[in-house]
């Protein structure tokens, strides 16, 4: 069976195989690569979590790209970078010339806007989307749709939307807002306002968080990586609290060159729930983010 559109948790891949006797082979592609760019083959190793190897006559290159869309250098093995495509399966360009700006670092190399890494054997591993798309159940959501709706509220100064891990849909949109100075409004009111002003139902934020100040870069742009970390942390906290009500966890979200994001869990008060270690894999099986338990006993 083939699968695409969004990353699938390893636990779901394994469960499907156990129940049906059939393997799911994850692949990757887009309209610009005539649907398919990589796949798992019937021969050789099938690496669960990767999207396979390039198809014949297709080249995939991982590179560091500057803000103007130019190649800085090629990434090392297992180093995360922009996924570039070339070959007979790659389209020659968009009809609207403005859409071609910054997506062709070289004449024959198309920048997909996705981020990933190639391992030693040429398997591709997706780790993120450079353009911040939120994928909810295979449905691509432009965060700008969510942000524009919230920004239309008279008491909202600025809004930013990111994807939060979700056990059912893979990701769901959540929003962070900074209010106009002196304004008072509840998070539920903002969530209702957004829902009523977004025509695309899937883009309505499931949660809205009011922040004193949103994180920004040195040039004043909203720094979404920090907001994603907050969203991931909240999702893990919710799952852990539901499963281990008597155990207190500290979560540390770290950047990882190979994995993208790594979630470090530290149990600081088990209060009799010493068996939580054996239960963690089941509780967190739907998360695609890599996580590790910090052993504080040694």
Where in the sequence are the language-model features?
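Conserved beta-strand termini and adjacent loop/short-helix elements that scaffold enzyme active sites
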Residues: 27, 63-65, 162-164, 211-213, ...
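Conserved short beta-strand edge segments in small beta-sheet-based binding/regulatory domains
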Residues: 199-210, 246-247, 283-298
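Conserved nucleotide-binding/hydrolysis micro-motifs of P-loop NTPases
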Residues: 7, 32, 183, 215-216
């Amino acid at each position: 069976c083939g699968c695409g559109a969004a990353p699938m948790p390893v636990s779901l891949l394994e469960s499907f195989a156990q129940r049906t006797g059939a393997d799911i082979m994850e692949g990757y592609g887009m309209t610009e690569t005539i649907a398919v760019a990589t796949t798992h083959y019937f021969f050789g190793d099938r690496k669960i979590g990767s999207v396979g190897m390039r198809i014949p006559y297709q080249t995939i290159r991982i590179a560091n790209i500057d803000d103007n869309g130019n190649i800085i250098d090629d990434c090392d093995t297992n180093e995360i970078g922009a996924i570039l495509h070339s070959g007979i399966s790659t389209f020659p360009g968009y009809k609207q010339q403005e859409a071609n700006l910054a997506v062709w670092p070289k004449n024959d190399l198309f920048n997909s806007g996705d981020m990933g890494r190639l391992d030693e054997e040429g398997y591709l591993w997706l780790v993120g989307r450079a353009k911040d798309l939120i994928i909810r159940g295979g449905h691509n959501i432009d965060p700008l749709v969510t942000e524009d709706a919230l920004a239309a509220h008279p008491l909202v100064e600025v809004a930013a939307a990111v994807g939060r891990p979700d056990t059912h849909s893979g990701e769901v949109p959540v929003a962070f807002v900074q209010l106009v100075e002196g304004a008072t409004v509840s998070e539920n009111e903002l969530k209702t306002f957004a829902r009523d002003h977004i025509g695309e139902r899937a883009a309505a934020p499931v949660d809205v968080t009011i922040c004193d100040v949103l994180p920004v870069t040195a040039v004043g742009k909203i720094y979404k990586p920090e907001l994603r970390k907050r969203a991931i942390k909240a999702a893990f906290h919710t799952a852990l609290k539901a499963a281990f009500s008597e155990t207190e966890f500290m979560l540390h979200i770290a950047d990882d060159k190979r994995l993208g994001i790594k979630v470090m869990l530290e149990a600081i008060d088990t209060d009799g729930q010493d068996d939580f270690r054996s239960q963690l894999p089941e509780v967190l099986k739907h998360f695609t983010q890599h996580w590790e338990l910090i052993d504080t006993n040694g």
